[in-house]
């Protein structure tokens, strides 16, 4: 497995919103899901990897869903 050239991370204050944003991120760009988990009570962390442009697109999509 080749290592991703870029990684991006988003932290959400709601597990439900984080899960929805994760889904949107993976549907928007060709990125690999590296980490998706709760990190403490009610918070959700998503880390994706891939090309720089794909990671930027995925992060933008995730941020839009998380608002």
Name every feature range the model reports, one short phrase each.
Residues 55-64:
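Alpha/propeptide regions of enzymes that mature by internal proteolysis
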Residues 29-30, 63-67:
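A common structural junction motif
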Residues 2-49, 53-54:
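The feature marks the first
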